[in-house]
Amino acid sequence: MIKESSSPALDADKIEVPSPKDENNSSNSEAATDNEDFEISDDDDDDRNHKHRKREARPQSFDENTEQSPGGPLKKRHKISGGADSHGEAQKDFFPKFKRRPGAGAHSRAPRVNPSFRDSSASVAARAPMTRGRGRNGAPWAQHEPRFNTLEMIDFASQMASQGPPTHPSLFMGPALPSGGSAQNGSWGPYGFMPGMPNGMLDPIHPLGMQGPIQPAISPLIDLGMPRQRCRDFEERGFCLRGDMCPMEHGLNRIVVEDMQSLSQFNLPVTVPNTQGLGIQNEPGTAPVNTSSLGGSKGVPAKDIKSAVTNDVLKLNGTTALAVSDADVYDPDQPLWNNEHPDASAGFAHTDGVWNAESLGYEAAREQGNQVLAADSSQNSKSSVWGRIASKKLGHGKTANATSTSATGNKRNESYDEMAPSTVHVNPASAKDSNGQSNSRIFGDVGRQSNRASHKASRTLYVNGIPLESNRWEALLSHFQKFGQVIDIYIPSNSEKAFVQFSKREEAEAALKAPDAVMGNRFIKLWWANRDRIPDEVEGRIPAKSSHMSAALANSVPQPSSSNRGKENLQSATPRASSGSSAEASGPGTGHKMLPANSVKSLPPDTKRQESLELLEELRKKQEILAQKRDEFRRQLEKLAKQKGLANSAKQAEAGGKEVASNDVHRVTDSKSMNTGTEGPRDAAGTLQNRTSGELASSSHKSSATSAQKPAVATKQTSPLLVPSQNRFKLDNRTTSFRILPPLPPEIADESVLKDHFMSFGELSSVVLEDTEAYNHDATLKPSLSCSACVTYTTRQSAEKAFIGGKSCKGHTLRFMWLTASPGSTNHSRFQKTSIPARASSFSSQTQNMPSESSTTVGKMSSTVKSSTTAKPHSESMPTATSAKTSVEIPKALSSRDSDVSQ
């Protein structure tokens, strides 16, 4: 049985600090009074509010062990509950009065991040005043949670990033732009979200709530250590069209292409207006950049931040803000470069107020690696994200540095090539080149820049980034000839670039716009070159450096139609006016015609092209006519040679049948036919060559009538039917002399008569009459019977003609014998074999002195050897050959004499 207390009230001085058990199990001092007691004084009300606010601020529970208040003895503890009923009533009134916030369970409080934070008076003083109901009054929405400071936020963010992606980008947002959002709309600022967050996690209610344009270069700088996702476009397609604006990770070896025209080979999309996306505004405007929020970010040097902010401010201000009005999304159905609008989009246009190379007087720098093509100006209603990169302002004190883009991303230290495209881009971060020298030479005169800008290439493409092993004209031709006729390919030695020129601009544009990778390599880029190697007014001129390449191109490129043939052949026929040598003009399947360069140089520019076309057409017609005449003349010569050989063979057979045996006649016929068959075509070929040379010389003389002197013509033989080579035949040591065997008729034994007779067959060298009386011991012989003649011509062909056709003179038939013969020849020895026995038989029929015949024959043979030696002293093989034939023929003569004697 519980004993009740005798007194309803106790002394307040005896109860100073209640125990935790009493505080939880028994009634409180506030619970002992009614509701009016709480409203007695403002002092009591402030004390209660402060007490309960402290309970919410620190972690506690309703367990047995409750944290003791550090403030000393409690106030107003002089009243104690009188019983359980009053305690229950007080508890019922107390909990509805001070109800906790929704969602805060009894055991759901998490420990504080920093337990000592509430005891730090400095932290409390530095903290901004907060009220209950944050987000529902006029306080800035981007104010930090007071329980977290900046350093703890960064550390905690890095811990959360390692555990997984956050559920919402509202965690630990950074400071936003002023007026970037309000508590009512709840839109997130452009700088608040973290780099690792996907861009789609924006407020779906107000996607266009930002009051300033996006800052593409600042968001990646706020790197709080959170890993970023790899860009899918960059990994799979090899390039990312967002460039620096993409929040994804692209790796360390990325290449940022700042010129837009180099990306024209891809189907680059344009933006679609009124589409919700990241960083889109409805009205153009600028916003200040809060650089103070970037100072505490990790891993970003201060000077890099300053440089990046400067660039971004330049891009935000001015006319480039208009390019951000459209949506930053891609439409594959509307490519950046299409057939309806072949020019570049409006994003490529240079604004005069922002960038004008001609008005500012900037010259494309002839520095190392200046091979970036300037974007062409055009008119288009669409704009793209590349418009933000196309126009840049020049900062004060900054110098323009022309940067080059290649397959490896490195600057190439090469000499400037005028054909390589170049432009000037602002690069404040790098005001010096790779050698540390200031790029102060980029400022040039306005005249040169405007002159170069007006003379851009219209049909020549600049190909860069070609691997050295693939940089061959065969590979380039196989790729670019799909788009049209390639008239010139120039490849600098030991380089990764090339220049390809087409016959028409449409073909070059088709090759530039083609989505296929060049030669199967997506790192090979195309631009317009600065100039055409073959100008329009003198189209077809080939420099001396690439003559070998152009000849190969002419063989591999298909032949055009007859209407365009003159125009296309001109590129290989008309030489450059500045060169000292002329090129060749190739006809369809015929030889080349030579055209001097000075004949075109003196003509005015307007009529130069027309005159060249007419001259080329005339040369082509002459070549065709000459080819037809040559073929016809060759057929006639062959036919005539056959007929002449047969007639001479029959005639010689009749003459030889009267003097020699039938078997010797066959040998003579065979030898004559063989000589006719071999020497006839040679003579015809010589005549043809003379005619061809004469016609070529006459045509060349006509074409060079306007020149002061004939230049040296670079001859390149492509057909054996042109001017004959001097070394066409081998060294000919065959004799050009033959002997007229005795007896000579009296009316013929005269040098003047013999010269008149043999001069019709060719150019005579000498005609010598020889008297053989010194060797003739028979005094009964007449002087004419012992006389012979030696006829010598300047050429072997003339001697053969006279040997065959000159045997009939004034009704008499003469007999000939070659004086010497080459060791390998058998044709001439046949004549000697047939002539000597005939001569011996004639001698034997005219004399009856047998013993003297032998000596006479030997004497005649010896005299023959001596005379031949004196007539042909330069032949080294003559004595050997003559002695050999003497030793062979003497027994035959003696044998023939013996046969006559026996008869």
Swiss-Prot record:
It comes from the Eukaryota. Residues 11-24, 86-96 have a biased composition (Basic and acidic residues). Residues 432-441, 556-576, 826-886 have a biased composition (Polar residues). This is Zinc finger CCCH domain-containing protein 27. One of its GO terms (cellular component) is nucleus. It comes from Oryza sativa subsp. japonica. Residues 397-410, 577-587, 693-708 have a biased composition (Low complexity). Residues 33-46 have a biased composition (Acidic residues).
